[in-house]
Amino acid sequence: SEFTPVTSDLTEKMFKEFFDSSEAAVFTGGPDVAAAFSSLPFDHLLFTGSTQTGKLVMKSASENLVPVTLELGGKSPVIVDENADLKNTATKVMRGKTMNAGQICLAPDYVMVPKGKSEEFVKESETAVKSMYENLKYNQNYTSVINEKHYDRLNNLIEDAKEKGADIR
C-alpha cells in the first residue's frame, strides 16, 4: 500500500531474501504503479486491497486474460451460537477487531448474538478490550488509523450510528 511504505519496503526485502526473482516479487507504489503493473501479461496476479482498486486491477488484467486472485475488503461477520462461551468468544472477537486498529480484512465488523445475550456480549467485549489495552486513545503500543481519510470515514460511521440510536461506548 502507498500508505505503508515501511511495511512495503520490509516485505520487498524479505521476498528478495527468501524467493528467487522468477518465483515472486514485490512492487511498491501508488495507483499509477498498480495500473501499469496489472496490465502486464503475467501468469497470475494476486491483489490485496480495496474493492474499488480491485475492480481496476481486474479490468486491466482482463486485457491479457491474466488470472487474478483478489482479497478485497469485506464485512467479516461473526455469528455466535446460543451455546457459545460469551467471555471466550468476546475475547477472540475483540482481539481480531483491535488488531492493527481494525484495519485488516478479517477484522469483524459486526456480531450476531442470540436474542437476550447482546448485553452480556457487550460487557464481555468491553472487559476483553480493557484487559488487552488499558487505554486505547493514549496508548503508544496501539496503532492509529492509517490516514485522515479513513479516520473521517470511521467518524462519519459513528455519527451515523448515533443518529440512528446506537449505543456507542
Give the positions of each predicted feature.
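Generic structural signal for helix capping and beta-alpha/helix-loop junctions
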Residues: P5-V6, A34, G54, V78
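CheY-like receiver
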Residues: D9, A36-F37, K92
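Short beta->alpha connector loops at strand-helix junctions that form conserved
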Residues: S1, T28, T48-G49, D81-E82
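Active-site phosphate/pyrophosphate- and oxyanion-stabilizing loops and adjacent acidic/basic residues
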Residues: K13, A35, K55-K59
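Conserved donor sugar-nucleotide recognition element shared by glycan-biosynthetic enzymes
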Residues: T4, G30, A34, S50, ...
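Conserved small-residue-rich beta-alpha loop and adjacent elements
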Residues: S1-S22, L65, K87
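ALDH superfamily catalytic-core signature
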Residues: F19, H44, Q52-R169
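A structured beta-alpha segment of the ubiquitous adenosine-cofactor-binding alpha/beta core
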Residues: A25-D43
